[in-house]
Amino acid sequence: MSAAKQLFKIVPLTPTEINFLQSLAPVVKEHGVTVTSTMYKYMFQTYPEVRSYFNMTNQKTGRQPKVLAFSLYQYILHLNDLTPISGFVNQIVLKHCGLGIKPDQYPVVGESLVQAFKMVLGEAADEHFVEVFKKAYGNLAQTLIDAEASVYKTLAWEEFKDFRVTKLVKEAEDVTSVYLTPVDGFKLKPIIPGEYISFRWDIHNPDITDIQPREYSISQDVKENEYRISVRDIGIVSDYINKKLQVGDIVPVHAPVGTMKYDSISKKGKVAVLAGGIGITPMIPIIEHALKDGKDVELYYSNRSYQSEPFREFFSNLEKENNGKFKLNNYISAENQKLQVKDLEHINPDEYDVYLLGPVAYMHEFKTYLVGKGVSDLKMEFFGPTDPDC
């Protein structure tokens, strides 16, 4: 991909303009979700061509509007300096790159946001508000465009590439692993453990005509020029993958990206992995690489039931093969087993790298505990939009 497209001129806001926008922060906090929900409705009706870049399930649940509202609020609070939210911004950049977001889509979002503010706030969204907001939005949009252009340059390929399904393996009663290889024979590079790939699914449903974008973690190292993803049946697309996808089917795939990557240069000798349910998928290559590097690895693995626990045999064998270097701690909700913070009391931040992924409530509980314990570099990410609740 070429150099970043210059769609907006970055013009620093004046102190007066910053104060004006920040004075509206309470309004954005209170009405933000209404504004963003209105924005998406307006945008999808006015610019239907962008629908295929959005997960419509996250629209129906309200998760995507909630995340965008949180993003706008945080941006307004940090207009002087984005450094405190740089991690959050970086996750947005990588998700945009994984989905193949183009610079030309930013004016569409900007115009839709302005219309939504006018509809929700009425006279409060006057000419002065619109002028200052457009200036601030343009600064943020061009910053993201520039950052995304830098990421695109590092990816293994541009755009989406057709992959063929080569194998389907049932890992649990509701989890299927999908093996895929490039149709054109492109040689896949080794992954960085923790990366994910984005897909554009046509699920052949007469009631759902839009292409469905989804992101899935790569659940093992590249072998035989194949990626593997492992998908739990919990939604429209995952149901299609588990019940209707067939060997030989073709699906477009974007190059890997990710924020929760294995830290191969860390000098710490121990790794603790906390995985809830299907959050185990990116942890598999992370665990394997950590063991190859000679680290002691502890896995705290929570599932609803034995029947819904993927990779049970794999981890059992891994524990046997590694002579005490890998310790598996299983927690099954149906058996009244639950990971407790007391199980993690021994984790010394100076000795352990810690990885965390699972349902939002699970992540919130253990992130709060681990950060309070002094784990300042906790490695975690979110399935779906970056969640403001965690």
UniProtKB/Swiss-Prot annotation:
Cofactor notes: Binds 1 FAD per subunit.
Site feature Influences the redox potential of the prosthetic heme and FAD groups, where: 95, 381
Chain residue ranges for the region called Reductase: 157-390
Site (Involved in heme-bound ligand stabilization and O-O bond activation): 40
Cofactors, names only: FAD; heme b
BP term (GO), one: cellular response to nitrosative stress
GO MF annotation list: FAD binding; heme binding; metal ion binding; nitric oxide dioxygenase NAD(P)H activity; oxygen binding
Domain Globin as annotated: residue spans: 12-149
InterPro entries in UniProt: FAD-bd_FR_type (IPR017927), Fe_red_NAD-bd_6 (IPR013121), FNR_nucleotide-bd (IPR039261), Globin (IPR000971), Globin-like_sf (IPR009050), Globin/Proto (IPR012292), Riboflavin_synthase-like_b-brl (IPR017938)
Binding residue positions for heme b: 96
Active site: 106, 148
Listed EC numbers: 1.14.12.17
Modified residues (N-acetylserine): 2
Sequence positions that bind FAD: 196, 214-217, 382-385
Subcellular location: Cytoplasm
Record domain FAD-binding FR-type: where: 158-263
Database matches in Gene3D superfamilies: Globins, Nucleotide-binding domain of ferredoxin-NADP reductase (FNR) module, Translation factors
Keywords for this protein: Acetylation, Cytoplasm, Detoxification, FAD, Flavoprotein, Heme, Iron, Metal-binding, NAD, NADP, Oxidoreductase
Binding site for NADP(+): 277-282
A Pfam cross-reference name: NAD_binding_6
Stated family: Belongs to the globin family. Two-domain flavohemoproteins subfamily.
Domain notes from UniProt: Consists of two distinct domains; a N-terminal heme-containing oxygen-binding domain and a C-terminal reductase domain with binding sites for FAD and NAD(P)H.
Entry function: Is involved in NO detoxification in an aerobic process, termed nitric oxide dioxygenase (NOD) reaction that utilizes O(2) and NAD(P)H to convert NO to nitrate, which protects the fungus from various noxious nitrogen compounds. Therefore, plays a central role in the inducible response to nitrosative stress.
Protein name: Flavohemoprotein
